[in-house]
């Protein structure tokens, strides 16, 4: 049975469960004092090379974005173009997002301490919230200025400088898209190759179809590495942001070209400003949604808690699961707590070990608190 394999396969846990000499009470319960589960998650799952590569790419992107943003701010003032300034504000939101991703990678190596027992993972959420506030503040100032100009219509815009600055931004974003896109497509090629091998093996193991369907419920992650997935998500997110920035720069460049040819059409600059400001504000809504979900301690979006509960009930010795709670400390750092009523004669220690292994291998939950009740 797949279930038996999940409960038995625990190469790292056996050493952890036996290492420090616990008290008799702890031995009877099957609970041994351990280091923070999130610390073990980082050491067990993440790969140093993957982290270093993500850090290098994100740092390079931040540096390039700061260069483009600085040029756009200076050029925006020179051209008296709010559309260029809005483009710079959108870049500011990207820099803030990349800094949060970089902070998340950095914070993952910080150890928990007695006063911060969950570690410093939620700093990522606080940093994201502050970056969103900064974006809304800057966008609000630009929108206010655009409305003032619409009412007065007294400002002139240098279309030539506006076109040149936005063309520079478009070119730099194109370079970043091509650079990140190479890594993005390479990652998907590897994934496709793995999927092809899986199909090939599936044809040679037709008799195991039923067992695999049961495992789908018991092991939905199917061996995915959560840390590597998280690193790839950071890079893919940066790729999508670069694509959006390139499209926005193209829009501003077209607006600059129109004003360059028709200097009186200053309204084009203000329309671009309002449209792209709304675009920048809309881009923060998914971030706010994630922040709200984490602070409200909701079940992670991609997790089916009913399927999780059914999987827990399939573990040997488990009769009833109740008071099941699942929430996130930050993105990808999941905590679980539950009460279990065991079958008569079942070992609490084996149940706890089985639940912990199931949560870790099937859902990437490294911090599970399990209370086995007596009837």
UniProtKB/Swiss-Prot annotation:
Residues exposed to the Cytoplasmic side: 1-57, 106-122, 182-240, 286-375
Pfam family, one: Cation_efflux
Keyword rRNA processing appears in the UniProt entry: no
Any one GO CC term of the record: vacuolar membrane
Transmembrane stretches, start-end: 58-78, 85-105, 123-143, 161-181, 241-261, 265-285
An annotated Gene Ontology molecular function: metal ion binding
InterPro entries: Cation_efflux, Cation_efflux_CTD_sf, Cation_efflux_TMD_sf, CDF/SLC30A
Region (Required for zinc-binding): 182-206
Keywords associated with the record: Ion transport, Membrane, Metal-binding, Transmembrane, Transmembrane helix, Transport, Vacuole, Zinc, Zinc transport
Keyword set includes Cell division: no
Subcellular location(s) of the protein: Vacuole membrane
NCBIfam families noted in UniProt: CDF
Family classification: Belongs to the cation diffusion facilitator (CDF) transporter (TC 2.A.4) family. SLC30A subfamily.
Purpose of the protein: Involved in sequestration of excess zinc in the cytoplasm into vacuoles to maintain zinc homeostasis.
Protein name (record): Metal tolerance protein B
